[in-house]
Structure formats: structure tokens, C-alpha cells
Amino acid sequence: METLHHPLVKMEEDYALSSDSEPNSTCMANTWDWKSHNESYSLSQTPSPQSVSPAASYESTYSSSPHTGQGLEEMPFSYSLLQYPTLCHGDNGALTKKDHGHKTSMTTHRRRKASEREKLRMRAIAEALHTLRNNLPPMYSQGRQPLTKIQTLKCTINYISELTNLLQCSKRA
């Protein structure tokens, strides 16, 4: 804010001096007329929008004070580089990952481990159900289609109940 204040005060002084001395002065018009300069720009003269702060965007090396003969480039202004957060641009992806890398990697690692455990658990359940289906008598199967998980469990419960009843009947006799 301080760097913006000084150029504005200087412009106010220049305007007051030029308007007090001659009301129809062309001095002010020459100072602000961008078409009056016939010099061409090169890439080295044109600052990039990311390297100059917005406060200094109106200050050009071609503006000069009409009464002092001193250009703005000779005045002590500071141009500050803008620092944008890395999350906004994502230009520095490695740095963004480093900031949260440990936590993210641990979460990802835990998720992968849990996924592996779940796969192994589901594989074990599938093998057990396959074994049950193979050990059920053919009368419990539905022909060509394999039993679903629920059907397999229900048929197994019925089969075990029948076997239990047979054992109890044989013990009584």
C-alpha cells in the first residue's frame, strides 16, 4: 500500500502544478498520452503479469514528471513478486504432495491394506460356499444354475437339520 501511495501523491502534485500554471496546457496530455511515444516495445521491456504487482502496473518507464525531468524509473519504487499458494496453481505438484505427503501416503497405504484384507476375506468365503455346494446332495441343487450364497446357506441349514433328525431317530431305536 505504501508503494501505491507515493506515485498517487506525485500524480496529484503534477496535476495541480500543470493545471495552476496553464489551464490549457499540453503538458498533462503529453504525460498521459500513450500514443505520443513512438518507441517500440521488446519482450525484455514488457514485464510479465506475474512478475509485477498490480499496484505498479500503471507505472511505466515512459512516464516522467514534467517539472523535475525525472522518470519514475529513477524513483525508489519497489516491485514485489507475487507469491501465490501452490495449491491454487498446482505448478509445483511435488511440493504440494510433500506438504500433505506423509498423511496422504499413510491413508492410501491403509486403504490398500484394508482392500487386500477384504479381498482375502471374500475369497475365503467364496471357497467355503463352493465347498458347501459340492457337499450338498443333488436334490438341493437347482439343476444347472449354481445356488446363490443365501440359497446355499439355507439349503445347508436344512440338510444339517435333516441329518440331525436322522441321528436322533437312530439313537432312539
Curated annotation (Swiss-Prot):
Keywords: Developmental protein, Differentiation, DNA-binding, Nucleus, Transcription, Transcription regulation. PROSITE patterns: BHLH (PS50888). Residues 109-163 form the bHLH domain. One of its GO terms (cellular component) is nucleus. GO terms for molecular function: DNA-binding transcription factor activity, RNA polymerase II-specific; protein dimerization activity; RNA polymerase II cis-regulatory region sequence-specific DNA binding. InterPro entries: bHLH_dom, HLH_DNA-bd_sf, Mesogenin/MesP. SUPFAM superfamilies: HLH, helix-loop-helix DNA-binding domain (SSF47459). It is found in: Nucleus. SMART domains: HLH (SM00353). Residues 39-68 have a biased composition (Polar residues). This is Mesogenin-1. The gene is msgn1.
